[in-house]
From Swiss-Prot:
Tissue: Red blood cells.
Originating species: Phoca vitulina (Harbor seal)
UniProt record similarity statement: Belongs to the globin family.
Keywords per UniProt: Acetylation, Heme, Iron, Metal-binding, Oxygen transport, Phosphoprotein, S-nitrosylation, Transport
Signal peptide positions (record): none
Stated name of the protein: Hemoglobin subunit beta
Tagged with keyword Translocase: no
Amino acid sequence: VHLTGEEKSAVTALWGKVNVDEVGGEALGRLLVVYPWTQRFFDSFGDLSSADAIMGNPKVKAHGKKVLNSFSDGLKNLDNLKGTFAKLSELHCDKLHVDPENFKLLGNVLVCVLAHHFGKEFTPQVQAAYQKVVAGVANALAHKYH
């Protein structure tokens, strides 16, 4: 991902304020609600029967936190996203058979959740920088797909 120095600073400054537990669960939960076909990858998560069930599901929250912790690793390695996400790309491709388009969907949902949480602080410039980052992460996660 090519970010200017200003964009990198904006991304890392805002990320320092993110509550990974809260935002991760909310982003993954919203993905599962808005794009219900993504639920098929989470059969073992129990009750995903309604928006309330999904948003309150402890397994969704825990996995959302895990996802955002990985995203944090990516933010520390913006110049080597493919290397950073190589193992996760392989896992999601070869073992889990996740449609790589879902990575883009989750990235866009994450941007919406960040905008909701940070309001005016999530300026158009910050949003543009985050859009670049989530696109880069989605691309890196899709790298092992044929």
